[in-house]
């Protein structure tokens, strides 16, 4: 089983944030290789600044991933924007815990090189996310979208 070294930083005092043990459990479930990650929970201002500075998009997004190194361990940062995650969970009528789990898995997969830039890549990444979420005991985050395709 791949090893995980994870530092969780709470830079946002948002309500109902998962604890470090939960984040580590979700990240471990998606690991493919030994990984060292920093997972940072941010407010909307920091999320917007990071998205603007690194992606050229002037809004806060739910998750950003910054892979930094590949050898000998995969190293990178995952940023979760607490207000955006909470808003999306409410809009999608899903639990906040489930949405945090999904976005943590999603971020780890991005660190591992998975992407959703074209339909084939998106289908592969989504299938891994769906499998991982079900293994963790959560609903398939794409089940309603798959029915629409």
From Swiss-Prot:
Pfam families: YbeY. The keyword Nuclease applies. Keywords: Cytoplasm, Endonuclease, Hydrolase, Metal-binding, Nuclease, Ribosome biogenesis, rRNA processing, Zinc. InterPro entries: MetalPrtase_cat_dom_sf_prd, YbeY. Its EC number is 3.1.-.-. Zn(2+) binds at residues 106, 110, 116. GO terms for cellular component: cytoplasm. This is Endoribonuclease YbeY. One of its GO terms (molecular function) is metalloendopeptidase activity. NCBIfam families: rRNA maturation RNase YbeY. It is found in: Cytoplasm. GO terms for biological process: rRNA processing. Binds 1 zinc ion. Transmembrane segments: none annotated. The keyword Hydrolase applies. Disulfide bonds: none annotated.
């Amino acid at each position: 089983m791949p090893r995980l070294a994870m530092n969780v930083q709470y830079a946002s005092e948002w309500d109902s944030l998962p604890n470090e043990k939960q984040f580590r459990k979700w990240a471990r479930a998606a690991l493919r290789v030994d990984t060292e990650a920093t997972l940072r929970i941010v407010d909307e201002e920091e999320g917007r600044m990071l998205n603007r500075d690194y992606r050229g998009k002037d809004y806060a997004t739910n998750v950003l991933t910054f892979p930094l190194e590949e050898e000998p361990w995969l190293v990178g940062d995952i940023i979760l924007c607490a207000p955006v995650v909470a808003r999306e969970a409410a809009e999608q009528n899903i639990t906040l815990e489930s949405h945090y789990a999904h976005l943590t898995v999603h971020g780890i997969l991005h660190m591992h090189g998975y992407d959703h830039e074209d339909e084939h890549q998106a289908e592969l990444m989504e299938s891994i996310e769906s499998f991982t979420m079900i293994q963790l005991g959560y609903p398939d985050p794409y089940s309603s979208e798959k029915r629409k395709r």
